[in-house]
Amino acid sequence: MAVLGVQLVVTLLTATLMHRLAPHCSFARWLLCNGSLFRYKHPSEEELRALAGKPRPRGRKERWANGLSEEKPLSVPRDAPFQLETCPLTTVDALVLRFFLEYQWFVDFAVYSGGVYLFTEAYYYMLGPAKETNIAVFWCLLTVTFSIKMFLTVTRLYFSAEEGGERSVCLTFAFLFLLLAMLVQVVREETLELGLEPGLASMTQNLEPLLKKQGWDWALPVAKLAIRVGLAVVGSVLGAFLTFPGLRLAQTHRDALTMSEDRPMLQFLLHTSFLSPLFILWLWTKPIARDFLHQPPFGETRFSLLSDSAFDSGRLWLLVVLCLLRLAVTRPHLQAYLCLAKARVEQLRREAGRIEAREIQQRVVRVYCYVTVVSLQYLTPLILTLNCTLLLKTLGGYSWGLGPAPLLSPDPSSASAAPIGSGEDEVQQTAARIAGALGGLLTPLFLRGVLAYLIWWTAACQLLASLFGLYFHQHLAGS
């Protein structure tokens, strides 16, 4: 195994910086707590008592004199004219929030992972080491793993709630996305060029000789079926994870547009960010993407706007730009969520009757206490898509367009199936066979198909969930 050298030094340096600088310099903390976001403070009990005309009894004798052996909960009219004060969201306020430390660590790790990837790409572009392991792949894989962990952490909240409404919604969407994932896999490559068919063909071509040596010819179709079923199950679980982030995104998108009525440029960015999953779906729809740019239907003269390699590079760049665009409009979305406290109070004032003062305070505080969860719901799909894009470029053998794309080896298993010396023991021979089997399975074409499927499917789930969220908040939430 080749020595990592410079890449290992950069990895150790990055890990040290991430550990040492976290208390002093944090992108996640700056994104949420730099003072540009403001939150609403709940009205104090004294203010609510003054509005209700019920001053607090000064002592036990006064309560007994008024016939109150035990003080009843304070209730005020729902339309009481109290005001909600605002204050900047600071780090001191955020440290007590649930999941803030998880949010900070996850986002900062994703930032450092991106920095390692940029250095590695520059290192390979300038020096081109052929025998070194690309350590940025491990950073991206770790980030994808932590993204799934964040999805599990947030989704567990809905399954642990006493009310089963959120749990039912997750299970319903999981079943729906399971059906859609199975339908997507039967779409022809001429329509949806995810690359699953060439990837499976490459895998089976390399696995077939290995299975024949063991007499396991029957396992080849079973392996293909298992991979397709596994991709469908992964799509179902991912769809369940993205259900409530999509619903939340629709709500914050509507509110952010309302808050930015006098800023047309910001509204344009919000619309573009919201429709970014639709652009991602378009990138892999061959008739209206690759074929249209390769042979545009303009006049009788046939010409090509982009070559296949240029289209692949442009697709990678567009994916990165769309992820950065969604990151750029994070604060308008978070501010729109924090303003839900005021909207809930205004909705309360349109109702008749009385309400306990404690419930008013809880309605306001609950919005602020949930802001880190909303931040994770917004940023985790973005980070997952971005790192899958980086993995697609590296493991799929693509290029950024700044240099020639690396050539894909047609038979990677042939290199791993090198003759083993007679002096080597049985353990080394078994390890070599396992390495050959893995090399035949994880071919660049197969990884292209799997990663493209994950990127496309993540965008599809986000789009469907957010569109349903728009319909829900527009027509059903107020009814």
Curated annotation (Swiss-Prot):
Gene Ontology biological process terms in this record: cellular response to oxidative stress; cellular response to UV; negative regulation of intrinsic apoptotic signaling pathway in response to DNA damage; positive regulation of DNA repair; response to retinoic acid
Protein family per UniProt: Belongs to the TMEM161 family.
Residue numbers on the Extracellular membrane side: 29-98, 156-166, 246-263, 326-370, 471-479
Membrane-topology descriptor: Multi-pass membrane protein
Keywords assigned by UniProt, alphabetized: Glycoprotein, Membrane, Phosphoprotein, Signal, Transmembrane, Transmembrane helix
Cytoplasmic side: 120-134, 188-224, 285-304, 392-449
Sites carrying sugar chains: N34
Top-level lineage group: Eukaryota
Record's signal peptide: 1-28
Protein name per UniProt: Transmembrane protein 161A
Species of the source: Homo sapiens
Cross-referenced Pfam families: Tmemb_161AB
Keyword Membrane: yes
